């Protein structure tokens, strides 16, 4: 698979990464451990060298899964994980944000153990903590980099001003935020900021939490533990209204003799050479389909047509419930 550099950092990874969250958390019950290990290892065989996890996924179990699966290939892959939530040790529930420097260092030590490694390739602040100056956060990660425990610093769902302030203390290698044909807000301010500063962009939910694959409609029932049950964009009414986006992708995919998911990923890959999407899946055939997107080349005309057609479709429903929306873009 082709490689990409995340901005001006020397972190070079496969053009597509693997978002591992859904193997343990967020989209219904966790997969059986051996199934998760097999899927992650199949990604390695398919050329993926960039794997994304976080302590809060599970919590903790996703890091353990990723660590075990990647142990035989550790020198050939980059592992990204995240800090920034307060997790109740008794219940395992999120209990707000915590990016105090002492806590960041505790999380790093615990994540290193769960990931079975002596260094974290990319350590993201999962959400901006309004109670801790971003300069202190960047300084704490800088210390971890100096100590050889972390290689690169990242931010997630941060606003442009926060990115600038953090980058002035410790160069930010990558920003991870949602970006897809279904959510294009980063184009206004975030992407120009990243381009100016030389920071890579790692879009999560590049397939719109599965919606852009064309396999979800208004009648799809989600498991009771599936995060999409509380997402306004995923109410049955909004799924019905948003079907126009999927139909459009289906039409383009048919013309190109590929799948809607491959169109959505190829579109992202064509946006900038320093964009590395991290689609997730629990299914081997979907992994293979996603990886196939790296061989799709959309012509300038294809991209223009897609641009024109999608710009005429209004997307219905917020991407987060109100409480979670308050945590992004700060």
Positions of the model-derived regions?
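Beta/alpha (TIM)-barrel catalytic core signal, keyed to glycine-rich beta->alpha loops juxtaposed to Asp/Glu
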Residues: 3, 128, 132-308, 313, ...
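Alpha-helix N-cap and loop-to-helix initiation/capping positions
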Residues: 31-35, 61, 65, 95-103, ...
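Short, acidic/polar
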Residues: 30-43, 99-114, 159-164
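N-terminal binding-site loop/beta-alpha segment at the start of enzyme catalytic domains
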Residues: 1-78
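Active-site groove signature of glycoside hydrolases
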Residues: 112-130
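N-terminal small/glycine-rich loop or linker at the start of catalytic domains
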Residues: 9-27, 80-95, 119, 124
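Acidic (Asp/Glu)-rich catalytic clusters
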Residues: 67-78, 113-116, 145, 167-170
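Conserved beta-strand positions
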Residues: 18-20, 53, 122-125, 155, ...
């Amino acid at each position: 698979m082709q490689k990409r550099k995340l901005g001006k950092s020397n972190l070079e990874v496969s053009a597509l990464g693997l978002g591992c969250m859904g193997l343990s958390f967020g989209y219904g019950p966790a997969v059986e451990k051996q199934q998760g290990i097999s899927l992650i290892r199949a990604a390695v065989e398919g050329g993926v060298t960039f794997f994304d996890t976080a302590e809060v996924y599970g919590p903790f179990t996703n890091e353990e899964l990723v660590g075990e699966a990647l142990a035989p290939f550790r020198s050939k892959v980059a592992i990204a994980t995240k800090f920034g939530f307060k997790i109740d040790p008794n219940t395992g529930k999120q209990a707000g944000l915590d990016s105090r420097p002492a806590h960041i260092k505790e999380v790093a030590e615990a994540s290193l153990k769960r990931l079975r490694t002596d260094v974290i390739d990319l350590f993201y602040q999962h959400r901006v903590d309004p109670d801790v100056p971003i300069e202190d956060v960047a300084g704490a990660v800088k210390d971890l980099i100096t100590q050889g425990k972390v290689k690169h610093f990242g931010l997630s769902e941060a606003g442009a001003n926060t990115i600038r302030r953090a980058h002035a203390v410790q160069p930010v290698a990558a920003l991870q935020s949602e970006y897809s044909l279904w959510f294009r807000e980063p184009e206004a301010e975030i992407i120009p900021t990243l381009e100016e500063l030389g920071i890579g962009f790692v879009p999560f939910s590049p397939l719109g939490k599965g919606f852009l694959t064309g396999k979800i409609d208004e009648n799809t029932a989600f498991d009771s533990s599936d995060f999409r049950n509380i997402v306004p964009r995923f109410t049955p009414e909004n799924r019905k209204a948003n079907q126009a986006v999927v139909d459009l992708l289906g039409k383009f995919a048919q013309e190109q003799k590929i799948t809607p998911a491959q169109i959505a990923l190829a579109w992202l890959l064509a946006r900038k050479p320093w964009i590395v999407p991290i689609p997730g899946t629990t299914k081997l055939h979907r992994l293979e389909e996603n990886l196939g997107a790296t061989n799709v080349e959309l012509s300038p005309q294809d991209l223009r047509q897609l641009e024109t057609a999608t710009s005429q479709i209004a997307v219905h429903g917020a991407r987060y419930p109100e409480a979670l929306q308050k945590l992004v873009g700060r």
